[in-house]
């Protein structure tokens, strides 16, 4: 059986060590365990690598150490990624100032990912962006890309494997 392909934007990796958001940090760490177990096929792009490299030395080293814990594929963005990212702006559901977010989404679509997970509710995980992405993928003939916060993976795991809830 093929594993679900999941694209991680930088916010997911960053929240592994986000002391000022303990609940999201805990959820992200739980999801990271699933990645370490190899339950999903994980993707990041060179945009993620670039954004991590913009962090302070200490934060950058911490995030790279986390990445070393899992298997992942790196998507190299190219002209096709840029063209698709530009369409998101042209269609008006993302703005030019969110260009890197557009590139994350475009990279995930072009790599054939099933999901992109992100803690970025302002630009990625919101109704306007999700509807816009659906319109573009349908119009351009790409596979649908589902966009969720990382916590949705925990909910899926509970459904797949049952919970500890013993209600009858």
Where are these predicted regions, by residue range?
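Active-site neighborhoods of divalent-metal-dependent phosphate/nucleic-acid chemistry enzymes
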Residues: 74-131, 154
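Generic structural signal for residues in well-ordered beta-strands
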Residues: 42, 74-75, 147
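Short, well-structured N-terminal submotif of metal-dependent ribonuclease cores
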Residues: 1-44, 53-65, 90-96, 130-133, ...
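C-terminal end-helix/capping segment
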Residues: 125, 129-146
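Short, catalytically relevant binding-site loops at active-site mouths
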Residues: 48-51, 80-82
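Short secondary-structure boundary segments
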Residues: 10, 46, 119-121
């Amino acid at each position: 059986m093929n594993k679900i392909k999941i694209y991680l934007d930088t916010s997911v990796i960053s929240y592994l060590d986000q002391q000022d958001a303990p609940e999201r940090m805990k959820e992200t760490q739980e999801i990271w365990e699933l990645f370490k177990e190899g339950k999903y096929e994980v993707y990041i792009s060179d945009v993620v690598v670039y954004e991590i490299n913009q962090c302070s030395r200490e934060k950058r080293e911490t995030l790279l150490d986390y990445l070393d814990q899992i298997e992942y594929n790196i998507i190299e963005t190219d002209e096709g990624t840029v063209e698709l990212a530009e369409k998101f702006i042209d269609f008006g559901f993302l703005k030019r100032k969110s260009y890197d977010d557009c590139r994350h989404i475009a990279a995930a679509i072009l790599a054939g990912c099933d999901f992109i997970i992100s803690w970025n509710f302002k630009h990625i995980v919101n109704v306007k962006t999700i509807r816009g992405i659906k319109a573009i993928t349908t119009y351009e003939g790409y596979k649908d890309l589902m966009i969720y916060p990382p916590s949705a993976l925990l909910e899926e795991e509970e459904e797949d494997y049952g919970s500890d809830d013993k209600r009858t």
